[in-house]
């Protein structure tokens, strides 16, 4: 069962990723919003390169995804990663709705979970590692602020390894939304939904799977049977780097209050909240964020190796 890249004049797949795909070697997609908007410089560029190295160490090829000069890129050079990291907020945050406009204007864009999934699927990449998915924001019953990531998971056939939804979100409503749209929520060696900085939450996953092989098999069966759409693989942050629930909850509640007072909304909301939580925790949340991304990259690479070995 081979996955071929879709021919697209706006898609540029790097030579390393092209060679891997043509030779049926495992590839793991990575997003770029975390580089431009999720972490400060220079931690962002250092982390991005560490994540790529972690994937290589575990037998797969990394494909960091972004829009560069109006081209969708699957596989970035170190120079391109450093460019996104330095420019930070000057880089447009790009989800599904934004892609055609950023491409048409020849601009640069940092891809969210949703747009990274889209470009990964075009390139023939089936698995993607990130920190946390977007979801239903707190207060969404008034604002209807729901991340486009959730709709993308319902229709684009890419598995996303994450530490759950970002803990700044309403985790209960996020799980309900995923259930409504038929998106499997897999807990890796856990029955409880991880809450990004914390290993557990009051909410449950749909199913617990304890090995990369089991997850790879579930991916293959889902898509072989014609069931389109993604899967969420929720991987708890390593215990030494997990944050106390009381500390992170207090910081999140304050950050959310401030976002409401300052009328921060839309695509600016998540970067604002993450940055403010980092400030309120004295940088502890940034350290935890880096470690959970590395942990997710390692698991994604192991799943990718199993998937390619058995099903490609």
From Swiss-Prot:
GO terms for biological process: nucleobase catabolic process. Signal peptide: none annotated. Mn(2+) binds at residue 145. Substrate binds at residues 93, 113, 147-149. It catalyses: D-ribose 5-phosphate + uracil = psi-UMP + H2O. It comes from Photorhabdus laumondii subsp. laumondii (strain DSM 15139 / CIP 105565 / TT01). This is Pseudouridine-5'-phosphate glycosidase 2. Belongs to the pseudouridine-5'-phosphate glycosidase family. Its EC number is 4.2.1.70. GO terms for cellular component: cytoplasm. Catalyzes the reversible cleavage of pseudouridine 5'-phosphate (PsiMP) to ribose 5-phosphate and uracil. Functions biologically in the cleavage direction, as part of a pseudouridine degradation pathway. PANTHER family: CARBOHYDRATE KINASE PFKB DOMAIN-CONTAINING PROTEIN (PTHR42909:SF1), ZGC:136858 (PTHR42909). Homotrimer. InterPro entries: Indigdn_synthA-like (IPR022830), PsuG (IPR007342). One of its GO terms (molecular function) is hydrolase activity, acting on glycosyl bonds. Its cofactor is Mn(2+). It is an enzyme of class 4 (lyase). Binds 1 Mn(2+) ion per subunit. The active site is at residues 31, 166. It holds the Pfam family Indigoidine_A. Keywords: Glycosidase, Hydrolase, Lyase, Manganese, Metal-binding.
């Amino acid at each position: 069962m081979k996955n071929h890249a879709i021919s697209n004049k706006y898609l540029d797949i790097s030579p390393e990723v092209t060679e891997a795909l043509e030779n049926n070697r495992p590839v793991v997609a990575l997003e770029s919003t975390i580089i431009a908007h999720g972490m400060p410089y220079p931690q962002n560029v250092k982390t991005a390169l560490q994540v790529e190295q972690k994937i290589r160490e575990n037998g797969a090829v990394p494909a960091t995804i972004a829009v560069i000069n109006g081209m969708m890129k699957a596989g970035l050079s170190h120079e391109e990663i450093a460019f996104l990291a330095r420019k930070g907020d000057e880089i447009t945050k790009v989800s599904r709705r934004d892609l055609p406009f950023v491409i048409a204007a020849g601009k640069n864009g940092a891809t969210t979970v949703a747009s990274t999934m889209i470009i990964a699927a075009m390139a023939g990449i089936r698995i993607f590692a990130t920190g946390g998915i977007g979801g239903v924001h707190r207060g969404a019953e008034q604002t209807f602020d729901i991340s486009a990531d959730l709709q993308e998971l319902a229709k684009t056939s890419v598995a996303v390894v994450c530490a759950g939804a970002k803990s700044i979100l309403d985790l209960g409503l996020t799980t309900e939304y995923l259930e409504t749209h038929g998106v499997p929520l897999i807990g890796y060696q856990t029955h409880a939904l991880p809450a990004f900085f914390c290993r557990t939450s009051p909410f449950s996953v749909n199913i617990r799977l304890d090995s990369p092989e089991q997850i790879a098999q579930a991916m293959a069966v889902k898509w072989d049977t014609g069931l389109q759409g993604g899967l969420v693989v929720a991987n708890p942050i390593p215990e030494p780097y997990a944050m106390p629930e009381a500390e992170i909850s207090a910081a999140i509640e304050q950050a959310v209050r401030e976002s409401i007072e300052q009328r921060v909304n839309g695509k600016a909301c998540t970067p604002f909240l993450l940055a403010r939580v980092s400030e309120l925790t004295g940088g502890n949340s940034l350290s935890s964020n880096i470690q959970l991304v590395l942990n997710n990259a390692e698991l994604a690479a192991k799943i990718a190796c199993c998937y390619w070995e058995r099903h490609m």
